Structures are given as structure tokens and as C-alpha cells.
């Protein structure tokens, strides 16, 4: 999936400056060169450990520094996670993403995280986790457990980043992505529109992502969900056309990546979402909640997909995947499963 093209800030800005309809037309042409039109990859995201995060990301209701009314929860039991994954699979999801509100996971939690990955993978689902920063050994353990994707967003441009987060550096994020890639895990990384950034920052974010040694296989583009109690609760609303522009530019700059229409869909009408799909978005989070914020329910999404003639992209398992799933399923059936019910931290 690597690409030899190196994007400049000026090139990205030129795309943002194109007339809206011309930009959408180009993005749709690029999209059709690499993906089946009218297909959308569907993921489900579960918060496996909620709140009490020590970081200061100004957009996040899970930070312990802000009074948002969110009740913190310890790491879920493994069986609870597997039950949620099974429901997601039965509802049509092909990837199950597990997110924990940590700066980084503790080594004591790694066996439980490995069991979650193995159990979800045994169901035939792709697996994704977002756990914060990882050390080399933690990355290797997740890779050996069979983790398919790791999410670690860059959030915004390097220049604007310090206005949003101070508890980890931009380089920390890039280093984590590098470790994940070197371990053979696919990368999921994107950003947020509506933090107070300008067009230069949106262009800068996409330049950073597109110029990674290998661009992310999955690029989530989030619209800020404003939560009372966070420093960004009173930010101005994002102009839908500017959000759609960001989707289109991401599609053109990262033609082989899945561009995910991520957080903020609950605030979008059907017309805005339709234009996002036209602009090259071909992945969504499916289910009524994204970590702690609202998301359209499955029934609403299926109704919209029907109106637009969109089909859910089916996962094609590799021979290695099938063999690993069979092995993991056998291990889960024969193992003493008592530890699945006593995994809370």
C-alpha cells in the first residue's frame, strides 16, 4: 500500500481551494480507481475501559481533568467484550474496535487484551484496538495475539496540536504508529475537524498522514462532538461543506486507504452523509454509541444505505486468517474459561 508520492502543504491547499463540485468529481474518480463504488466497510467501536484518563485532550469527555458527568468504568471482563463483538458481527459489522481511555496500557492488563483480540478474531471479525501509546513489547504481544489494526490518531496538524493536547507530543504519536507498522499491524490514524483549526491545519494533518512511509489503511475523519464540560464545548459548528471537502481531499491524497466517516454523524443529516460518501468516504462506525458519544443506530444506517444503494463491504479472509480463526476457536472451546469472567481491573 506504500506510495512514492510525497505531498506538500501547497499541493494539499490547492485541493482544498478547488471549486466544491470539481473537488467531489475528482475524489469520486480516484475512489473508483481503487474501490468498488457503493460499498462501505462497517466497524463497531466499544469502550472497554471508560473515563479517568490522565491526558488533557481538550475535546475528550474521558479526561479526568474535566467535569463532564461521565462515570468512569474499569476494564471490561473479557466475556462481556466477546458478547458485544458477537452482537456486532450478527448486526453486520466486519471489524470490531476496542478502545480504552489510557495514556498507555499497564503490563498487567496485556493478558486480558490478548484474550479479547483472540476471542474476537475467532469469530471471523477483523480486530482493532486503541489503547494509547505502546512500548515495543506491548506492540509485539498484540501482534502475536493476531491484532489486525491499531488506531492512534494524529488529531490535527503539528502546528496546531499543542493548542489541543500537552500530555503527549506529536512525535509520541508518530513513534507509536511506527512501532505498530514495524510489528506488522495495520495502521488506523486520522483526525478531528472542528477543534478550532483552519484550512492550513486540515491540510497539514492530511500531509502528515499521506506522507507516512506507508499511509494508514484506515483514515477516520471525525467531526468534533462538543461535550459540555470540555474546553471545546462552545466551539463553532463545522460548516458541512468544509467537512465534506476534508473527506474529499483525504480520498485524493490517500487513494488506497479506507476513509472513515467517523464521530459526529449523529449531527449530520442524510444529505451531508450522502455527499461524504460521494466524496470518497467508504467506512463508518456502526452502532448507537462511539465510546461515550451518540452515533446513528443500525436501523437508521441501514435505511440510509438502502436509499443510497450502498452495500456493506464483505471481508475476504486470507488463508492465514482462516487457519488462525480455527486454531483460536479450538483453544477457546477447550480452555478453562473461568478467567473470562474475572478480568476486571
Curated annotation (Swiss-Prot):
It comes from the Bacteria. One of its GO terms (biological process) is biotin biosynthetic process. Its EC number is 2.8.1.6. Keywords: 2Fe-2S, 4Fe-4S, Biotin biosynthesis, Iron, Iron-sulfur, Metal-binding, S-adenosyl-L-methionine, Transferase. It catalyses: (4R,5S)-dethiobiotin + (sulfur carrier)-SH + 2 reduced [2Fe-2S]-[ferredoxin] + 2 S-adenosyl-L-methionine = (sulfur carrier)-H + biotin + 2 5'-deoxyadenosine + 2 L-methionine + 2 oxidized [2Fe-2S]-[ferredoxin]. [4Fe-4S] cluster binds at residues 53, 57, 60. Pathway: Cofactor biosynthesis; biotin biosynthesis; biotin from 7,8-diaminononanoate: step 2/2. PROSITE patterns: RADICAL_SAM. SMART domains: BATS, Elp3. [2Fe-2S] cluster binds at residues 97, 128, 188, 260. This is Biotin synthase. Residues 38-256 form the Radical SAM core domain. It comes from Sodalis glossinidius (strain morsitans).
Amino acid at each position: 500500500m506504500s506510495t512514492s508520492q510525497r505531498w506538500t502543504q501547497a499541493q494539499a491547499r490547492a485541493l482544498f481551494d478547488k471549486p466544491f463540485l470539481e473537488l467531489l468529481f475528482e475524489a469520486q474518480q480516484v475512489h473508483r480507481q481503487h474501490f468498488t463504488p457503493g460499498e462501505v466497510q462497517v466497524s463497531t467501536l466499544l469502550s472497554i475501559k471508560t473515563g479517568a484518563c490522565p491526558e488533557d485532550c481538550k475535546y475528550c469527555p474521558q479526561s479526568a481533568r474535566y467535569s463532564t458527568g461521565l462515570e468512569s468504568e474499569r476494564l471490561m471482563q473479557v466475556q462481556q467484550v466477546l458478547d458485544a463483538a458477537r452482537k456486532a458481527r450478527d448486526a453486520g459489522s466486519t471489524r470490531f474496535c476496542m478502545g480504552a481511555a489510557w495514556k498507555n496500557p499497564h503490563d498487567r492488563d496485556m493478558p486480558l487484551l490478548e484474550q479479547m483480540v483472540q476471542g474476537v478474531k475467532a469469530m471471523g471479525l477483523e480486530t482493532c484496538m486503541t489503547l494509547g501509546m505502546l512500548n515495543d513489547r506491548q506492540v509485539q504481544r498484540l501482534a502475536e495475539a493476531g491484532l489486525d489494526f491499531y488506531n492512534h490518531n494524529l488529531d490535527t496538524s503539528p502546528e496546531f496540536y499543542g493548542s489541543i493536547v500537552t500530555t503527549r507530543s506529536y512525535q509520541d504519536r508518530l513513534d507509536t504508529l511506527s512501532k505498530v507498522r514495524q510489528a506488522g499491524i495495520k495502521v488506523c490514524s486520522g483526525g478531528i475537524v472542528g477543534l478550532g483549526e483552519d484550512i492550513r491545519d486540515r491540510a497539514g494533518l492530511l500531509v502528515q498522514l499521506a506522507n507516512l512511509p506507508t499511509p494508514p489503511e484506515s483514515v477516520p475523519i471525525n467531526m468534533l462532538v462538543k461535550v459540555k464540560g470540555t474546553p471545546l464545548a462552545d466551539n463553532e459548528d463545522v460548516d458541512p461543506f468544509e467537512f465534506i471537502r476534508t473527506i474529499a481531499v483525504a480520498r485524493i491524497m490517500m487513494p488506497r486507504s479506507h476513509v472513515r466517516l467517523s464521530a459526529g454523524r449523529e449531527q449530520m443529516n442524510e444529505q451531508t452523509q450522502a455527499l461524504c460518501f460521494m466524496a470518497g468516504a467508504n467506512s463508518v462506525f456502526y452502532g448507537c454509541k462511539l465510546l461515550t458519544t451518540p452515533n446513528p443506530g443500525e436501523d437508521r444506517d441501514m435505511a440510509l444505505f438502502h436509499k443510497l444503494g450502498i452495500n456493506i463491504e464483505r471481508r475476504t479472509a486470507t488463508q492465514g486468517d482462516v487457519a488462525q480463526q480455527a486454531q483460536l476457536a479450538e483453544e477457546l472451546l477447550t480452555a478453562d474459561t473461568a478467567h473470562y469472567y474475572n478480568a476486571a481491573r
